Amino acid sequence: MPAKTATAVKRTTTTKKSAAKRKTSKAVKKAGKRTQSKAKGAQKVKKAATRRTPSKSAGARKATKKAGARKASTKRSATKKTTAAPAAAAAPATDAPAAAATPSKATGSAKKASARKSSAKKPAKGGKKKSAKKN
């Protein structure tokens, strides 16, 4: 029994880190955290950028394409959902008269859509005017 207590008492000593070492390790940890937060921020910025004008990098282009596809799919589902205006969906060329024939709610949404389209055609600051896309 006494032998056991003796082994329990014995402690392994650890060498104390010098102040400089402690500081550097702390700095390294902080730097790591900083880069992580920076990366997160960059992602957010990129997302915001894809919402705004498309950037010219391949990755950004892909992102905008995907965003466009997402938007298109939601638009498609929206047209499927509205049972009142199948004619408007069938004939996009005659958009305004079809909207006039449908109830007021549909006309409101159509107006919004047309406004969105016109705003899409407007050039970004210092950019060229975008050609009107069919879809």
Curated annotation (Swiss-Prot):
Composition bias, Low complexity: 1-17, 80-112
Keywords (A to Z) from UniProt: Chromosome, DNA-binding, Nucleus
The keyword Nucleus is annotated on this UniProt entry: yes
Coiled coil: none
Main location: nucleus
MF terms (GO), sorted A to Z: DNA binding
Region described as Disordered: spans on this chain: 1-135
Basic residues composition-biased segments: 18-54, 62-79, 113-135
Highest taxon listed in the record's lineage: Eukaryota
GO cellular component: chromosome; nucleus
Keyword Chloroplast: no
Places the protein is found: Nucleus; Chromosome
Chain's role: Histones H1 are necessary for the condensation of nucleosome chains into higher-order structures.
Protein name: Histone H1, macronuclear
The organism of origin for this protein: Euplotes eurystomus (Ciliate)
